[in-house]
Amino acid sequence: MKKSLLVNGLEHAVEISPGDSLLKTLRSLGYFGVKFGDEHGVTGADTILMDGKPVNAGLLLTAQAEGHKIATIEALGEHPERGWKPSDGLHPLQRVFIDTGAIQCGYCTPGQILAAKELLERQPDPTEAEIRDALSGVLCRCTGYLKPVQAVLRAAAIMRGEPVIPIDGSSASLPPFSVMTDSEEPVFLPPSGDAGDIASTTQARILPYIQVTSEGKSLKSVGKPVPKLDAPKLAQGKPAFTADFEIRGLLHAKVLHSQHAHAIIKSIDTRKARALPGVAAVLTHEDIPRVAYSTAGQSDPIPGPLDCFSLDYKMRFVGDRVAFVAAETPEIASEALRLIEVEYEVLEPVLDSQKAMEPGAPVIHDEPEYVNFADSDPLKNLAAEIRIDIGDVAKGFAEADYIFEEEYEVPKVQQAHIEPHVVVTYWDEDDRLLIRTSTQVPFHARRILAPVLGLPLKRIRVIKPRIGGGFGGKQEILVEDIAAHLTIATSRPVLFETTREEEFFASRSRHPMRVRLKTGVKKDGTLTANEMYALSDTGANGAHALTVTGNTGHKAMALYVGDGPYRKNPNIRFYADVVYTNHPPSGAYRGYGVPQGFWPLERHMEKIAKELELHPIEFRLKNALQAGEMHPFSIAWSEGRE
């Protein structure tokens, strides 16, 4: 049906389907500043202004917007240098988001700026609480909101016509930079009416002047106040991200996921799905090569087992892949998924990491193509094993006056980047497979995908635009092969973008761990021995299993070595088993295994100090590794200088 939309003062005649969202239509018109974050308006990445009020474009049908004035980030401002065309430049809100460093990944920035614009038009002199309330509908995974709040306070002062103290390195002072001399001390800006009472309410100052050292004077950027180089385009909502891309003949991919935690596909019938008009391809494990690989974006050789397949006959978690579909529209692809008929042999799942290695436990990886790494043993559901002994732990415990033992549990956590996993694949004019993807590891992706796709490296090119947050979740090869297989099958461009629900069951998370600590202590608070055992649940696949869990002990257990003779000769033990279960796979996450060690260790140290009536900080400092001392695990693992 035909509808008319008024967007940023321009009239658009659009041909839509009744179920088309306003988000879909705006992006099809090239308004890429409107982002997809989820289907329910929770992230607020799809925030626009309708008749001056913030709304979620993803929650509105296009037909509902007819007769209303729509404003997107593209209407606010533009680069001040537009050739011969006069330009008013960036909007004050865009400028201050750049100047204050409020932009990190930038995926949420258009929504935040639009929400702030509505607030300042309604309340020119807002309180910090009012600003936080206005921004609360646009989730930001990166900044913690301190800088966006500072930016809006500063913009409010500028828009009221009040003078504001310059921020060195801001867009207003480029070029050149205005910096202090060596003789001047750094000056921190006090709270003022220019930007609200920031220091007293957020316990942070606006921005310090930067003192450039003599070493920094000879350098172009290091030691000098430099704004984020790509902040201007992010503040304008320019097409900087993977899905901000147009190409003719684009197909849309969807994945059929397993509803069983552990099962074997006995039969799969795709005839009805293939016959559906608009379906270009349906792929199952019967249609593509069976190549074992690891999804971990790590250096070669990958320090972990090869235990993944693009598509497999065995399902190992709820959400595992059953089939891929490519169709002319996302709606047709979704309908095709419903037409695929699958018969399963349901197997007993392993859902408790403590039971995974018990005799007789169901074996999750019994495929002959499995490739071991180090001490992995798939028949025992063991993805990795770590055994590190430093000194003589038994002797250390024998010399202790007290022994403290406790068990802790660290839960599974999802990265929750606002931009979901998304990829576009197509053949270029040189018959190279172009993979445009939201990844943290473009070169690892290229290397890992080559054998999976049956292509030499030179025939694959990976393009990494800006990513809308990753936090380790995109250090994994999770979606690239889906679109690539479908492009190979159809010879057409393919877009695959995960739903927010898929992010939680088919993506990755922090490794949940059960951690047992045993510590020997003398009456004066000296540690004599420290022992950690970690049982790590890697889920259905072992990507990052060894390296993440290795960090758990490597970083935490080296922090407190003991005092006196124990300082030079600590007694430390770190053992870990990383087990397969039928949970969704774990993977890389910011901190990379370290929080799973530090959190229980610090709880444990606090408990010991309390029991011995010692000052918790003094107790820690007495036993802590000090500057200049050798890291005991680095010695054990032959890392660093001798």
Question: What is each stretch, according to the model?
Answer:
Residues M1-P191, A195-A199:
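Signature of N-terminal electron-transfer/Fe-S-associated modules in redox systems
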Residues M159-P378, I403:
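Flexible, low-hydrophobicity surface segments
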Residues R27-Y31, A296-G297, A398-V413, F496-E503:
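Short Pro/Gly-enriched beta-strand edge/turn motifs at strand-loop
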Residues T62-G106, I332-E358, A383-I386, E406, ...:
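Gly/Pro-rich active-site capping loops and adjacent beta-alpha segments
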Residues D38-G41, A129-S136, H285, K458-P465, ...:
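Beta-strand segments within the central parallel beta-sheet cores of soluble alpha/beta enzyme folds
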Residues V393, F397-E405, E409-Q414, L621-E642:
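Accessory "access/gating" subregions that flank catalytic or transport cores
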Residues Q112, E121, V255-E286, A323-Y344, ...:
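Alpha-helical support elements that line or immediately flank enzyme active sites
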Residues V149-L153, E184-I206, P303-A333, F471-V521, ...:
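Glycine-rich and small/hydrophobic secondary-structure elements
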